[in-house]
Amino acid sequence: MSKITIYQGDCLQKLKLLEDNSVDLIVTSPPYADQRKSTYGGVSTKEYVKWFLPISKELLRVLKPTGTFILNIKEKVQNGERSTYVLELILEMRKQGWLWTEEFIWHKKNSYPGKWPNRFRDAWERLLQFNKNKKFNM
């Protein structure tokens, strides 16, 4: 049987404990921009990409060449329009060396109506798949 190790703590600090090219699958759902401020302190949409890039750099380092990284993330509506921070993050991660290979939709059937008179509440979230190479395992 394989050994399983669980690390608890700040992901950026704990990732530094892992060897290069040692992880097969990474699935994460970091705090979305401007969400859960009381729990996580909140990261603004303007700062989100800058905040996440050091994490994605470490994830790229520890992921095996055939590994897969799944990022659960969601846009935020600000001042009547959707923020582009998720799209900006994808572009910056590509500059780091990530391949954006797939996108899945998580259909949230428990979504309830929003409080806005001119907008429906999203009943979905993105699951973005990134890989190091075009030949990868799922």
Question: Which residues fall in each region the model found?
Answer:
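Core catalytic lobe of class I
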Residues: M1-M138
